């Protein structure tokens, strides 16, 4: 999976994870998590990635439910049904299939593990008003690839924007154009289906 796509998947799974909230002023974040945790969610976003290299900007669509997701952006389509991950490049008709496994995996290479363990990984370090929104600052408690995060959530508990500082000092900013709540789906909806024999497939499972 290329780094841009990997970052984006990790960041969205960070947003929907439980943070062990306690204080009353975290109510909007609790509502956001409750909505995301109990539904299938579709997001349409723009992003920018700032690092020592040339800044990267783009648009992506992501749909997720629990530890299953599918994403389109950065020239790739990525599917995960909770057991396997498919990274597909239609331009060159190539696909790589990877397992979702606890063994020899890091949080950066397996976003599903990051989602599963997020209640242990992050805590809310502060919150404040940001215009009409509430801004939440999150800090990592254990190494997971993301050092800190800032989320802006409006009065209706809808995510507006997010900024993430990665362990490698890369900064990723995301503006959410739309959030759609969908009915829950079977895990098979997050797999690509039969891949044409014209594709070059590398199966690492």
Feature map (PLM): residue ranges:
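Non-transmembrane domains of secretory- and envelope-associated proteins
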Residues: 130, 141-148, 155-205
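One face of beta-strands
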Residues: 41-47, 58-62, 67-71, 147, ...
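Bacterial N-terminal signal peptides
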Residues: 9-18
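Bacterial N-terminal signal peptides that target proteins for export
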Residues: 1-9
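N-terminal leader/targeting segments and the immediate start of mature chains
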Residues: 19-55, 67, 193-205
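Short beta-strand segments that buttress and anchor functional surface loops
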Residues: 45-49, 70-74, 135-142, 161-165
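Flexible, surface-exposed loop/linker segments and immediately adjacent secondary-structure boundaries
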Residues: 100-131
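An acidic-aromatic
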Residues: 61-108, 172
């Amino acid at each position: 999976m290329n780094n841009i796509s990997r970052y984006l998947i990790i960041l969205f799974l960070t947003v929907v994870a439980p943070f062990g909230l306690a204080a009353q002023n975290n109510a909007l974040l609790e509502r956001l998590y409750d909505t995301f945790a109990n539904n299938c969610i579709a997001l349409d976003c723009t992003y920018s990635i700032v690092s020592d290299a040339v800044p990267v900007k783009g648009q992506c669509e992501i749909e997720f439910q629990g530890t299953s997701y599918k994403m389109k952006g950065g020239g790739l389509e990525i599917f995960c049904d909770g057991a396997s991950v498919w990274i597909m490049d239609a331009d060159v008709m190539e696909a790589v299939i990877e397992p979702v496994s606890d063994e020899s995996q890091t949080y950066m290479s397996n976003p599903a593990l990051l989602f599963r363990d997020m209640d242990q990984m992050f805590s809310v370090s502060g919150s404040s008003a940001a215009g009409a929104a509430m801004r939440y600052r999150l800090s990592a408690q254990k190494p997971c690839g993301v050092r800190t995060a800032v989320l802006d959530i409006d009065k209706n508990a809808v995510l507006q924007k997010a900024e993430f500082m990665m362990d490698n000092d890369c900064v990723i900013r995301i503006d959410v154009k739309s959030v759609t709540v969908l009915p829950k789906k079977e895990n098979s909806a997050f797999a690509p289906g039969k891949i044409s024999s014209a594709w070059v497939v590398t199966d690492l499972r």
